[in-house]
Amino acid sequence: CIWNGFTMNGREDDYTWSDPYIDNKQVVVVRSDSGIDDFSGLKGKHVEVQTDSSALAALEGDQKDLAATFADLNQVAEYNTAFMDLESGACDAIAMDIGVANYQVNSRKNPDDYKILDKEISSEQYAVGFKKGNTELKDKVQKTLDEMAEDGTVDKIAEKYADYGVPGALCIGKNSK
């Protein structure tokens, strides 16, 4: 199975899926002193995004009109580079997953130097993907996940990552059949 922030949306027919466990969204991070408070503030700005990310897919797809307002949309190999660019002023904003954004902002020396814009670029759900037709393994994993959600184990684990927004993003147990 594949299980590491694996987006199910758009791939529903490619795999056998568990129920979703995270409601994820793509957001924009800016410096707090940038004067950028919403998407309109991104007009004419230099925005970075990770190559092959959901944020890039959204900005090249459903949100291409938003991306067209940017001075440019630069792809980077990983978000550490993007944050160094944001810190140095080489870019004005970063489009990224909310969990990674929360992690990156909260791990900075001065987290208050950054803010995540309120509006999301797009949203998606994470689930565990299995080889198409492998319902036996999917059912075993799903049963365990459901038990963990029911007995509070999932919430206890998620609470360890509260600084990254994990508890609020959980949907496991809410969509169970």
Q: How should these model regions be labeled?
A:
Residues I22-V30, I98, N106-D146, Y164-K177:
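Periplasmic-binding protein-like
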Residues S54-N74, D112-I116, L145-K177:
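Ligand-binding clefts/hinges and TM-proximal coupling segments of bilobed small-molecule sensing domains
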Residues G35-H46, I172-K177:
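Immediate post-signal peptide segment of exported/extracytoplasmic ligand-binding proteins
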Residues C1-G41, E120:
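Acidic, polar ligand-binding/catalytic clefts
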